[in-house]
Swiss-Prot record:
Gene3D superfamilies: CD59. This is Cytotoxin 3. It comes from Hemachatus haemachatus. Belongs to the three-finger toxin family. Short-chain subfamily. Type IB cytotoxin sub-subfamily. Its main location: secreted. One of its GO terms (molecular function) is toxin activity. The keyword Secreted applies. The keyword Secreted applies. Pfam families: Toxin_cobra-type (PF21947). Keywords: Cardiotoxin, Cytolysis, Disulfide bond, Hemolysis, Hypotensive agent, Secreted, Toxin. It comes from the Eukaryota.
Length: 61
């Protein structure tokens, strides 16, 4: 699995074994502007201020 790992979308990395999800975190007030991206094993929960989106395909975040 390859996930974007920087704020600029064309940079990505191969996820280590066991991390089979990509995630993107953004502020609820500006959901189109990511604040953090990367690989994870479980999807973090969204909060009142931060929206988290997880996916399972290459560069989907």
């Amino acid at each position: 699995l390859k996930c974007h790992n920087k704020l600029v979308p064309f940079l990505s990395k191969t996820c280590p074994d066991g991390k089979n999800l990509c995630y993107k975190m953004s502020m609820e007030v500006t959901p189109m502007i990511p604040i953090k991206r990367g690989c994870t094993d479980t999807c973090p929960k969204s909060s009142l201020l931060v929206k988290v989106v997880c996916c399972k395909t290459d560069k989907c975040n």
